[in-house]
Structures are given as C-alpha cells and as structure tokens.
Amino acid sequence: MINLFSFFSVSLFCYSYISPFFLSMNFSLKNELTVLSYNIRYDNPNDGENQWKYRKERVANYIKEIRPDIIGMQEVLDPQLVFLDLSLTEFSFVGVGREDGKTKGEYSPILYNSNRLTLLQTDTFWLSETPKVISVGWDAALERICTYAQFKHKETGQKFWVFNTHFDHIGELARIQSAKLIHQKIKMLNTNNFPVIITGDFNLTPDTAPIKIFQNAYVDVMQKTPTNANNYGTFTGFDKLSNGEERIDYIFQKGLKTLKSTHIWLKTTSGGWASDHHPVQAIFSFNY
C-alpha cells in the first residue's frame, strides 16, 4: 500500500521529526525484521489538542512510511484499532479488549505485515493469578493483559514469537508477578527455542526488579543508551518542552541479532507529540 512519492514527500517535510538514522531503515531486507513498540495513548476526549482525532493520521502515516514487520501497540481502544486496520492495508492484527476478552477496554494488539509474515497461532492471557480468566491481578488497579503470537517469516521460513503487554501503573506486586508470569509463559510455549520478541509499556524504569527479570533473560535493545542521552526517555506526557526523561517502553529479544535500535520523536502538523510515549524501534536479523 506504500506510495514512494508520498514517502519521500512526508519524510522531507518539516512538520515532524524522524531520526535520520531511520530514514534508511524503511524497507526490511530478506532476513531482517523491523519491530516497533508504541503506546499510542487511548482516545481520551479530555486530552484537548492532543486528542486522538488530531494525532491518528500522523500515527498511521508514520507506519506507512517505515513499513515495519511487527508493531506491539498499547492503550488501543476498539475504534482506534478499526481506524488503523482500515488505514494500514498491508497489516493485520491480533488481540482483544482487556475488559471482556472481545472489544471492550484497551487492547495490547500485535499488528503484523501480512505480506511478509504468516500468523501461526495467537492468544491473550490476563496478568493475574488466573490468567485464563478476565481478572485484575494482585494489587493492580486495572485488568492487564499480554497478547502473543507465533509467526512464520515468509522469505526465510523462520518461526518466531512476539509477546506484547502493558503493565499496571500502580501495583508493585502486580508488576513483578506479571514479569514472572510472562517469562514462565514463554518458557512453556517456546519448546523449540525459536526467537522471541517482547514489546510493551512496562510503566517501569530499567533499575527496577521486574525489568531486571527480562534483562537477565533477554536483550534489552536500548540498554546501552546513556541515561544523559538526548533521546534516552520514552514518556513525555504530551509536554512539548520535554523529550521524555523516563525510559518505560521496551523491546526485548532473544535468538536474534540486533542491528539497529532507537527511540523515535514523532510529531504532528501542529508541533505536538503524536502520542505521550515515543515509539521504540529496532531492526533484527535472524541468526544463520
């Protein structure tokens, strides 16, 4: 669905910022995967000039520009997902709303490029003591979920897993138990040791115990970024004067080679942020 003329026009236009590093990363090579983790901020009518209706075209156009293979999104309500599904014709999605297991509440969907990937299996579990049941876990404030899928890369035949999640913003016990639950689920499912990718808004900084669980078992693609780097953080809260100080959004991987990774500054035509979180983006290659 990509239009090369529109790609170069938008990329050169001055209304938004995308790292020049990624202007050369838009087309995945035969044995590579481009992966994005992005909390797009739910459609909140109280967000004023930052409401979804003012941001949605920029988010969709950005995805069209870079044409990733996988996008783990967070805070996606059903109408937002419908818009993205209609706009991004190269992509399909998996996931459910966390409040009813269907369409109610926020999704943590996985969008995938169906021209390059074949979906093999998918499911969603709740981050709680009863993961197969719609539930609030431990001391969490809300229902939290993890949506996962197994894919086959059409060009190489390589199979791999993707897990996408959004941790609770309140419950300390919930966050550490959620990390343990996801790690255990991966070990249970991945009996063939296929590559694994984990995307998400974890509502946690890198020095916390739940993040250490993932860092000890997987590669945190941005772990080596200096804390004083200009692009270190991922959460701005829509503050136009802030680049984001806290790093709470992540991509982890195991069984792949990380070629490039960065946080993307993405703005709308009015100069505001396209979301209150920055996208995390990485390119991987299969190990041969």
Residue spans for each PLM region:
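Active-site beta-strand/loop signature of hydrolases that rely on acidic residues for catalysis
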Residues: 34-40, 59-84, 111, 149, ...
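Solvent-exposed loop/turn segments at secondary-structure junctions
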Residues: 40-43, 77-80, 98-102, 116-117, ...
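N-terminal, active-site-proximal structural segment of metallo-dependent hydrolase catalytic domains
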Residues: 2-8, 14-87, 98-106, 180, ...
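Metal-dependent phosphoester-hydrolase catalytic domains
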Residues: 116, 173, 177, 184-196, ...
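Extracellular/periplasmic catalytic domains that process cell-envelope and extracellular macromolecules
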Residues: 28-30, 64-65, 87, 101-104, ...
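Short, solvent-exposed loop/turn elements at domain surfaces
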Residues: 42-49, 73, 120, 172, ...
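Structured beta-strand-rich core segments of catalytic domains in phosphoester-bond hydrolases
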Residues: 70-160, 260-265
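Acidic/histidine-rich helix-loop elements
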Residues: 37-57, 103, 127-141, 168, ...
